[in-house]
Curated annotation (Swiss-Prot):
Its EC number is 2.6.99.2. This is Pyridoxine 5'-phosphate synthase. The record marks 153 as: Transition state stabilizer. The gene is pdxJ. It comes from Aliivibrio fischeri (strain ATCC 700601 / ES114) (Vibrio fischeri). Pathway: Cofactor biosynthesis; pyridoxine 5'-phosphate biosynthesis; pyridoxine 5'-phosphate from D-erythrose 4-phosphate: step 5/5.
Length: 243
């Protein structure tokens, strides 16, 4: 079975920094440690309200990352403009509501097909690889294909938040079916949202999954074990699921 990559989301380093309006902890330093520990890429979400990652972080990380940047962003003219100026290796288009604590669901690509398609085309023409953050739903997967995005990221939030083992298994089956269907359509399949050290193994074991993007649980573990160990431990669990 092929290997699997870990993308580390460092948004919550910025959340902690912004809580006091200080210059520390610096997401740039966190990215350096995560890369050293085995991260294949660094994910950051530049939200419209700038609640954690700031424009300054995007600029500096683009210059300093040794791996690659995955810039999560809403489908707006402002964000597309920032991406075209910054030119990250990857952009992941996500839904966004100002009142939410975190991204609550997948992007409704089929419901705004022309808008997403236009953004995807602009970014692709600039040499940026585009991923769409969607639920494991055939309609959304088909819409992603129509948009011309080479990657999707399957939303694993319902799986992660399931309150019973039966419910979690049902969600896992949906993700597995979605990953298989997307791969059959020629898409490269990533996944993420809500994944922890306790629930990641089953998702990592799905053969179609190319990369997992994980942040909150790694940063939580890092408070006690240190960031380098937290990243390395997550990567080890993921790789173990592929043996």
């Amino acid at each position: 079975m092929s290997s699997i990559l870990l993308g580390v989301n460092i948004d919550h380093v910025a959340t902690l920094r912004n809580a006091r309006g200080t210059k520390y902890p610096d997401p740039v330093h966190a990215a350096e440690i995560a890369e050293r520990a085995g991260a294949a890429g660094i994910t950051i979400h530049l939200r419209e309200d700038r609640r954690h990652i700031k424009d300054r972080d995007v600029r500096i990380l683009r210059e300093t990352l040794q791996t690659r940047m995955n810039l999560e962003m809403a489908v707006t003219d402002e964000m597309v403009g920032i991406a075209l100026e910054t030119k990250p290796e990857f952009v992941c288009l996500v839904p966004e509501k100002r009142e939410e604590l975190t991204t609550e669901g997948g992007l409704n690509v089929s419901g705004q097909l022309e808008k997403v398609k236009a953004a995807t085309q602009k970014l692709t023409e600039a040499g940026i690889k585009v991923s769409l953050f969607i639920d494991a739903d055939k309609e959304q997967i088909d819409a992603a294909v129509e948009c011309g995005a080479p990657f999707i990221e399957l939303h694993t939030g319902a799986y992660a938040d399931a309150e019973t083992e039966e419910a979690q298994q049902d969600e896992l089956k949906k993700i597995a079916a979605g990953a298989s269907y997307a791969a059959s359509k020629g898409l490269i399949v990533n996944a993420g949202h809500g994944l922890t050290y306790h629930n990641v193994e089953a998702i990592a074991a799905l053969p179609e999954i190319y990369e997992l993007n994980i942040g909150h649980s790694i940063m939580g573990r890092a408070m006690f074990d240190g960031l380098e160990k937290a990243v390395a431990d997550m990567h080890r669990i993921m790789l173990g699921a592929r043996k």
